[in-house]
UniProtKB/Swiss-Prot annotation:
GO terms for cellular component: cytosol. Catalyzes the attachment of alanine to tRNA(Ala) in a two-step reaction: alanine is first activated by ATP to form Ala-AMP and then transferred to the acceptor end of tRNA(Ala). Also edits incorrectly charged Ser-tRNA(Ala) and Gly-tRNA(Ala) via its editing domain. The gene is alaS. The lineage of its organism: Bacteria, Pseudomonadati, Pseudomonadota, Gammaproteobacteria, Oceanospirillales. This is Alanine--tRNA ligase. Its EC number is 6.1.1.7. SMART domains: tRNA_SAD. It comes from Marinomonas sp. (strain MWYL1). One of its GO terms (biological process) is negative regulation of DNA-templated transcription. Its main location: cytoplasm. NCBIfam families: alaS.
């Protein structure tokens, strides 16, 4: 059975069992900012399992694209060395949200494996959690599996409920036992059954994991039964395909073999067994789908993981003799294999290839030189087996070699890298680049808000509704008195709840009491009105009049509609690769984050602004339609990055063919209502992500008027017209730069003179020189210049300089290269800085710090000679 046929067979089977087929979610989780990538099928249903979202179905099945590279779940370093590790894989899964439970879940798994796929029953065995007698009995009595084929796995991870067969979202929240199905590859493969000392061998391979979420674990470890137990299952498509196709390695299945052949062709090798071809075939899958889902190569977070994988693939191509660009050429082959199942790949394949090519070209500039540095470092190790952390860092910092790429080369040469030494220099980067999932929830102390609030605010800003619930500090109460604040749930409301980047409405609830609504948020489908009771008593059951602040709502609508016009303008001017990465829409302004590789030029800036204002002047009707998600996609509606949509969606259209987007927010009636659109700033907020801030309506007019007024004042200072003011400012700036250059020259001469004088104060210490001095300089740059001058004059020295200005202490330490083995500038600074209530750090040869306590400086300087003497 081909991989594509297996995928469809799984989905069709569970569809026949009344499961809703749900599309694979993005590799970038939209509902969990702590998770680097989607790494399991259940991720897109996390909010459902936690009771925070309600779907129109209680059974679902998916083929989920997953990535395990970076963060807690990281298979990158093993890809290419084992038969089953991948950075990208597909997880087949079926899910029950309070519907069926253990009996049906086990029956479905067994029927699909043995009846649909026709796997021989004698090849299968299962594990259950040691205490899960119910699952054991279902396997034994209902399925008929003999006792010797059912293995109980206890708490084998160091604590209660810490087991391979007990699954939890986090330290608290939903959890429960699981049962796993294993396939026996036969006695000719080394390995033992699960739970045995030889369980890590390849003979018995887990193919399906069925999790029974039946408990809620509180912070104190107490386990309580969930009112609606659920089921979460996962089966790796590649693993089961290998079994069905009669091969032992995932890389031998049809999907991978076709990619390996394509990789061999583009790198120019005929050896299809080359390990590097496996790496390249795996990496083109993860890299391509990351880019499809909006990830762009960068030096932090998800973008850095993508960059690491791309560069690892390039290095393996280089290892096979391919010195030119090649990786991007494999996108076409991948589309042939997976485009039918994932049409988003076909749609964006040209963009994917373009981004990969750009990254290849960038890395090609330093790859050969970096490899030479690494090879020299390896040859110079002698009998040592560890590449120094400083070398690993240099390769990263100067030549763009991720540490795991260097480790890959080291591993091929029977070596290791000094990870601890590298981490000292890279700690901050590693913290940004690596994140792990931490699902956590303590449901025992939370208030349940069931049902859904009927939202009437698309057509009305006033109404009447009954108070259904009042919440104060997480507890339901019967009433609120004047002066008290809380959350109010109404049966229906015109107040928009904060979502989709749009802030929540404000206004009033009036009835027996007068309550100011300061914000409106949402929990699931329930609107929570944040109220401050100004008069009377507000009680559950009261009938209240709802009044949305019309001026704030209208101002917000201007900005929200403008973001749609802006989004489309950016796509038309910059390219289809532009994707929304985030937004904030409030009454004052709009903020729009989008993917783009570089800063916008002045011409692009003007073109985007002009295009939006043209749409405003055309005064298009803003049309809203409600339709099913498939019809919306067929209409060409853009789904915004990270947003979750239900089966019925609102489609917002501006102009017959200009902007069509899915959006649940509130908007103007016609684009002309926006009046004027004015961009006030554009800049980068992360690698590959830009941010535009803009104003609309009266705020845009006021900003333009303010700029005109400021320009008039500047022109007045120069006694020039507004048109000539720019030339005057440019001339003044040129003059200032010339004077600054003269000043820098003078400061350099002064530093040289001061250095000559200070150098004579250096003392001999164990064959080197030591200079500790407080100097009179006005800025950190002058202090650095003085340090450089002294290092040049003293040749072999440890130097610590201090300066005090405006009650602030500046410290700088320098160590000449030959002494850094024993004395490191960073360590010296860390010793001295606390005495002046400061902190700092730096490299072994130069480090800096700042402090707020000049009184402690003398004592700190007195300690330096003894500290240095102990080390040189």
């Amino acid at each position: 059975m081909k991989s594509s046929e297996l995928r469809q067979s799984f989905l069709s089977y569970f569809e026949s069992k009344q499961h809703q087929i749900v599309e694979s979610s993005s590799l970038v989780p939209g509902n969990d900012p702590t998770l680097l990538f989607t790494n399991a099928g259940m991720v897109q249903f996390k909010d459902v399992f936690l009771g925070e979202d309600i779907r129109p179905y209680s059974r679902a099945t998916t083929s989920q694209r997953c990535v395990r590279a970076g963060g807690k779940h990281n298979d990158l370093e093993n890809v290419g060395y084992t038969a089953r590790h991948h950075t990208f894989f597909e997880m087949l899964g079926n899910f029950s949200f309070g519907d069926y439970f253990k009996k049906d879940a086990i029956h479905y798994a067994w029927e699909f494996l043995t009846v649909v796929l026709k796997l021989p029953t004698e090849k299968l065995l299962v594990t259950v959690y040691a205490d899960d007698d119910e699952a054991f009995d279902i396997w034994n009595k209902d399925i008929g599996l003999p006792v010797e084929k059912i293995i109980r796995i206890g708490d084998n991870k160091g604590g209660r409920y810490q087991s391979d067969n007990f699954w939890a979202m986090g330290d608290t929240g939903p959890c429960g036992p699981c049962t796993e199905v294993f396939y026996d590859h036969g006695e000719h493969i080394w390995g033992g059954p699960p739970g045995s000392p030889e369980e890590d061998g390849d003979r018995f391979i887990e193919i399906w994991n069925v999790v029974f979420m039946q408990f809620n674990r509180s912070a104190d470890g107490t386990m309580a039964s969930l009112p609606k137990p659920s089921v979460d299952t996962g089966m790796g498509l590649e693993r089961i395909a290998a079994i069905l196709q009669g091969v032992h390695s995932n890389y031998e299945i049809d999907l991978f073999q076709n990619l390996i052949k394509a990789a061999a062709q583009v790198v120019g090798t005929q050896d299809l067994s080359a390990q590097s071809l496996r790496v390249i075939a795996d990496h083109i899958r993860s890299c391509s789908f990351m880019i499809v889902d909006g990830v762009i190569p960068s030096n932090e977070g998800r973008g850095y993981v993508l960059r690491r994988i791309i560069r690892r693939a390039i290095r393996h191509g280089n290892k096979l003799g391919q010195k030119g660009v090649f990786f991007h050429k494999l996108v076409e082959a991948l589309d042939v294999e997976m485009g039918e199942a994932y049409p988003e790949l076909t749609k964006l394949k040209e963009r994917v290839a373009a981004i990969l090519l750009k990254e290849e070209e960038q890395f090609a500039k330093t790859l050969d030189q970096g490899m030479k540095i690494l090879e020299e470092a390896i040859s110079g190790l002698g009998d040592q087996k560890v590449i120094p952390g400083e070398t690993v860092f240099k390769l990263y910092d100067t030549y763009g070699f991720p540490a795991d790429l260097t480790n890959d080369v080291a591993r091929e040469n029977g070596l290791e890298i000094d990870e601890a030494g590298f981490e000292v220099a890279m700690d901050a980067q590693r913290a940004r680049a690596r994140s792990a999932s931490n699902f956590s929830m303590d449901m025992s102390g939370s208030v349940s808000v069931d049902g859904a609030t009927e939202f009437t605010g698309y057509s009305n800003l006033n109404g009447q509704s009954a108070v259904e619930q009042i919440i104060v500090e997480g507890e339901s109460v019967s009433s609120l008195q004047a002066g008290q604040t809380g959350l109010v749930v109404l049966a229906e409301t015109p107040f928009y709840g904060e979502s989709g980047g749009q802030v929540g409405d404000q206004g009033w609830l009036r009835g027996p009491a007068a309550a100011k609504v300061t914000n409106t948020t949402k929990q699931g489908k329930v609107h929570l009105h944040h109220v401050d009771v100004r008069e009377g008593t507000l009680a559950v059951g009261d009938l209240v009049t709802t009044e949305v602040d019309r001026s704030l709502r209208n101002a917000t609508a201007l900005n929200h509609s403008a973001t749609h016009l802006l989004h489309e303008a950016l796509r038309r001017v910059l390219g289809d690769h532009v994707q929304q990465k985030g937004s904030l829409v409030n009454p004052e302004r709009l903020r729009f984050d989008f993917s783009h590789f570089e800063g916008m030029t002045a011409a692009e800036f003007e073109q985007v602004e002009d295009m939006v204002n043209e749409q405003v002047r055309l005064n298009h009707e803003v049309v809203t339609e409600v339709m099913d998600i498939d019809s919306a996609k067929a209409k060409g509606a853009q789904a915004l990055f990270g947003e979750k949509y239900e089966s019925q969606v609102r489609v917002l259209t501006m102009g017959a063919d200009y902007s069509i987007e899915l959006c649940g927010g509130t908007h103007v009636s016609r684009t002309g209502d926006i009046g004027l659109f004015k961009i006030v700033s554009e800049g980068g907020i992360a690698s590959g992500v830009r941010r535009i801030e803009a104003l609309t309506g009266k705020a845009a007019i006021d900003a333009t008027r303010h700029t005109e007024t400021a320009l008039g004042k500047i022109a007045g200072l120069f006694k020039a017209s507004k048109e000539a003011a720019l030339d005057k400012v440019v001339a003044l700036n040129d003059q200032a730069r010339a004077l600054q250059k003269e000043l820098d020259v003078l400061k350099g001469k002064m530093a040289a003179l001061a250095g000559a004088d200070l150098a004579s104060q250096a003392v001999d210490i164990n064959g080197g020189k030591l200079l500790v001095a407080q100097v009179e300089v006005e800025d950190p740059k002058a202090l650095r210049d003085l340090l450089d001058e002294l290092k040049s004059k003293l040749e072999s020295a440890v130097i610590l300089l201090a300066a005090v200005n405006d009650g602030k202490v500046s410290l700088i330490a320098g160590v000449t290269k030959e002494l850094t083995k024993n004395v490191k500038a960073g360590d010296l600074i860390k010793m001295v800085a606390p005495y002046v209530d400061g902190k700092g750090g730096g490299r072994p040869d130069m480090a800096q710090a700042g402090g707020n306590n000049p009184e402690g400086l003398s004592a700190a300087l007195e300690l330096v000679p003894g500290w240095v003497a102990e080390r040189v």
